Amino acid sequence: MVMAELQKRGVPYAKLDLASVDPFNLPVSGETIWACGIKQDGVQFELLKALELENHVINSTDAIATCASKVTTTAKIIRSGAPSPATCFTNSKEIVQKFIDTHGGKAVYKPVYGFDGNGIYMFHSADEIKEEPPYYVQEYVKNDRDFRIFVIDYEAVGAIKRQSAHLTHNIHQGGTGCAVEIPKDMADAAESAARAIGIDYCGVDLLPLETGGYTVLEVNGTPNWHCMTAPIPKLLADYLVKQDKEDRR
């Protein structure tokens, strides 16, 4: 869809297949490369890192790598002052248990490198964790929905509300989504998270707080735009064209 928007503008582009690229023998320099649909594996990261030396890759490999790790994402969000649930990352079940006892007798386990809501569950005792360490756990924030905010160039441009009968509300986990307006406090939370990561565009997942405002669950560096009514492909195409023009000045 983004490619179709570029075609409408008469913007020339070429597809780059990372499965068959040798970055040391590729005559590509001074270009804008949109890393769409990237698989989060070491080979593609290394290819893009090599290409970044002579080109502008969007999103950057550093940003994508940060978003792939819940630990690094959370560390940057907390350091920036953006809202985040209380979090524990440790090899020790004893420390996990102390965290649970301090945060209402339950917590949420999440795989460090998980995606689409896979492998996430609530537990009440550290002994319930079956996975090997390290353990990444967060306080449980009572909710019946979450929000995915699409951010481009540090501006919230689209949002959906996701709901399900389960702990996670991801569309891939059976959740349903509908487009919603973006109030200022929602935009502020999403935009501050994007700035904390330093990412061109992203999907920021937020939970509403009973006391008001929102907290940042995670930042997705390769987001889709399921259920969005905002013209995300058009806005992304506009951003890519703008960045390319700025890079060529």
What is the meaning of each model-derived region?
Residues 84-107:
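Rossmann-like NAD(P)H-binding beta-loop-alpha module
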Residues 38-40, 113-114, 222:
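Short glycine-rich anion-binding loops that position phosphate/pyrophosphate groups of nucleotides
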Residues 168-216, 224, 228-230, 234-249:
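A long amphipathic alpha-helix within ATP-dependent nucleotide-binding catalytic cores
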Residues 107, 158, 202, 215-218:
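Protein kinase-like catalytic core scaffold
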